[in-house]
UniProtKB/Swiss-Prot annotation:
ATP binds at residues 125, 171. This is Hydroxyethylthiazole kinase. CDD domains: THZ_kinase. Catalyzes the phosphorylation of the hydroxyl group of 4-methyl-5-beta-hydroxyethylthiazole (THZ). Belongs to the Thz kinase family.
Length: 278
């Protein structure tokens, strides 16, 4: 069994999560909070959404993993994110950071850089534009959406991973997962996923749930398994679910995640190592 095969044994990963039932605290935005909570539950985790700086450190201390999502950032929320992330680091809990909209405004860029400077981030999750902005390159981010074209996103994600010493997931038409040593391209998903507000938010907590629930998994293992599982669930929902458009497709997607017990396709066949640092 290759390293990639082992990392993307989706049935084993889902079994681990089902056994562990990891509690994941999400400090997330008020636009997609319900979707983030539901998909945590559907993967087999337990969601909690504490975001008050007065208690979030105590909640994260009892949790198995933590997501910080910058979707709706304000002064109080910024402090809660730092408190939550610090508690995750102190408890050696997996920490996923989703720097939503970084590069769109100076405030978001400052907050994202503060989180990366002050916290030990397990997995950094963003779209192509956000990851490009954090790598210090020119990015086209409009609001919280990536609207540019990023032909060199694998190189950019690898550079970002090396700069911030973390695992990077750069989501888009093709997804890139990069550690400081190597980058993988993942081909999985469906165009309808891009028509749902909050897909990236749901991916972020998916990564946190996999990182918290998979037994003996490295951050790269969790990022690969979570990203390819998320994409394959999107494909399965499109092919087998009942829907009439984006809204009903989202329901079909969540139903598919809830019922997923094994990969509907060969996960390793969807992953290609595209860069390696020797």
């Amino acid at each position: 069994m290759s390293d990639v095969d082992a990392a993307v044994d989706l049935a084993a990963a889902l079994g681990d999560i089902d056994t562990a039932t990891p509690l994941v605290n999400s400090v997330t935005n008020n636009v997609t909070v319900n979707d983030v909570a539901n998909i945590t539950l559907h993967w087999g985790g337990l969601p909690v959404m504490s975001d008050d700086a007065r208690e979030v450190d105590d909640m994260v201390a009892t949790a198995d993993g933590c997501l910080i999502n910058m979707g709706t950032v304000d002064e109080d929320g910024e402090e809660s994110m730092v408190v939550a992330g610090t508690a995750a680091n102190e408890g050696d809990k997996p920490l996923v950071v989703d720097p939503v909209g970084v590069g769109a405004t100076p405030t978001r860029t400052r907050v994202a850089n503060r989180l990366l400077d002050e916290l030990d981030v397990t997995i950094l999750n963003g779209n192509h534009g956000e990851i490009t902005a954090l790598a210090g390159d020119d990015a086209d981010v409009r609001g919280v959406e990536s609207v540019g074209e990023y032909a060199d996103i694998a190189e950019t994600a690898l550079s970002c991973a090396r700069t911030h010493d973390t695992v990077v997931v750069a989501s888009g038409e093709t997804d890139i997962v990069a550690s400081p040593e190597e980058a993988y391209e993942i081909t999985a998903g469906h165009p309808l996923m891009a028509q749902i507000v909050g897909t990236g938010c749901m991916l972020g907590v998916t990564l946190a749930t996999f990182a918290a629930g998979m037994e003996n998994a490295t951050p790269l293992d969790a990022a690969l398994a979570g990203t390819v599982g998320f994409g394959l669930a999107g494909e399965k929902a499109a092919e087998e679910g009942e829907y009439n458009g984006p809204a009903s497709y989202k329901t079909a997607f969540l139903d598919t995640v809830a019922g997923l017990e094994a990969a509907p396709d060969d996960p390793a066949g969807r992953i290609e190592r595209v860069l390696s640092v020797t």
